[in-house]
A protein has these predicted regions:
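Alpha-helical segment proximal to the catalytic Tyr-Lys
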Residues: 114, 160-161, 221
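C-terminal helical subdomain
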Residues: 171, 192-223, 230-232
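Short, small/polar-rich loop/turn modules that mediate ligand/substrate recognition or access, typified
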Residues: 163, 168, 223-225
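Substrate-binding pocket helix/loop in short-chain dehydrogenase/reductase
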Residues: 84-86, 93-96, 182, 193
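Active-site helix of classical SDR
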Residues: 109, 147, 155
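Residue(s) in the substrate-gating loop at a strand-loop-helix junction
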Residues: 131
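Conserved glycine-rich Rossmann-like NAD(P)H-binding loop of the short-chain dehydrogenase/reductase
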Residues: 15-31
């Protein structure tokens, strides 16, 4: 009823699809359905606890009773939980996050697939909203990542089950997206997430909705078993601290990357800090190549000017 789920429901409604909204919050869920209808769409709301398989079965049954058939299911409900080493989680945390993020998706797929098959719908679809954490695990996110890896795995396996019946099964894997999962995070935290992404911004829920609409459409009938990131290249690979753009910082005569390294190694205070983090660094070319990332921290501690730090990091990349 919020964030990505709301954006998908509204996008589907605006594009002529009959939509059944399901959420725990009656107020929020009904507001989404009413908004779709106010714009000329066709939508109803059914209050549902999406962490319970029995509730999802009832949701599917009511949907078929109201509309006569079911063409597709989007399983979006989920909760975040993280920032904690695995051993600090409680068993109750495990049960809570798996009941919604995994069991809820399983039930949506199970009862959704049954209803689609019984409806003899042409072009049926199952779309699961997973996460970039289901493609690339993140530190402190053991439980959340496990649930999302599970969603991606179920998606791919189910695609094999239903391909011959014309039912596509795909997962959308959002990266940092401006939704309520971030709660009341301060602006500085949001800026950090944006800066951590290669695209240097957070995603909008509507960008995930656009992909969901495509996957539900006739244009995507041969796309199945895919886990598609919507993440501004967050999962594409490791980011180097240095800039590939190489701004013109080496043309003012004196500064160049190799001399910057030499100057740093000649500074006793700098050498002490470097040795603290990276023993043997000053005389070890392989260490210089391997630990460019750590130099960002060292440079900040030493108060290096940004231009010198960039030059240094570029040199490390090429050692």
């Amino acid at each position: 009823s919020r964030g990505i789920g709301r954006a998908i429901a509204e996008c589907f409604g605006e594009n002529g699809m009959k939509v059944v909204c399901a959420a725990r919050s009656a107020e929020q869920g009904q507001a989404v359905a009413d908004g779709i209808c106010a714009k000329g769409g066709d939508a109803i709301f059914i209050q549902t606890d999406c962490s319970k398989a029995s509730a999802i079965k009832e949701l599917v049954d009511k949907t078929v009773a109201h509309y006569g058939k079911l063409d597709g299911v989007v399983s979006n409900a989920g909760i975040g939980m993280g920032g904690t080493p695995l051993h600090e989680y409680e068993v109750e945390d495990y049960e809570k996050i798996f009941s919604l993020n995994s069991e809820g998706v399983f039930a949506g797929m199970k009862y959704g697939a049954e209803a689609i098959l019984k409806s003899h719908s042409e072009g049926g679809f199952l779309i699961n909203v997973a996460s970039v954490a289901g493609l690339v695990p993140q530190r402190g996110q053991a439980l959340y990542s496990a649930t999302k890896f599970g969603v991606v795995g179920m998606t791919r396996a189910a695609a094999l089950d239903y391909a011959e019946y014309g039912i596509t099964v795909n997962a959308i894997c959002p990266g940092y997206t401006k939704t309520s999962i971030f709660g009341d995070a301060p602006a500085a935290a949001m800026d950090f997430f944006a800066s951590d992404c290669p695209a240097k911004r957070m995603g909008d829920p509507e960008e995930c909705a656009a992909l969901a609409l495509f996957l539900a459409s006739g244009m995507a009938r041969y796309i199945t078993g895919a886990a598609i990131p919507v993440d501004g290249a967050l999962s594409a690979g490791h980011q180097s601290v240095s800039s590939w753009k190489h701004p013109e910082i080496l043309t003012d005569g004196k500064l160049n990357s190799q001399s910057t390294i030499a100057a740093l190694m000649e500074n006793e205070a700098a050498k002490a800090v470097v040795e603290q983090y990276l023993p043997g660094f000053a005389d070890n070319q392989q260490a210089k190549a391997a630990y460019g990332m750590t130099f960002g921290k060292i440079g900040s501690m030493l108060g290096l000017p940004e231009t010198a730090l960039k030059a240094l990091l570029d040199a490390l990349d090429n050692l």
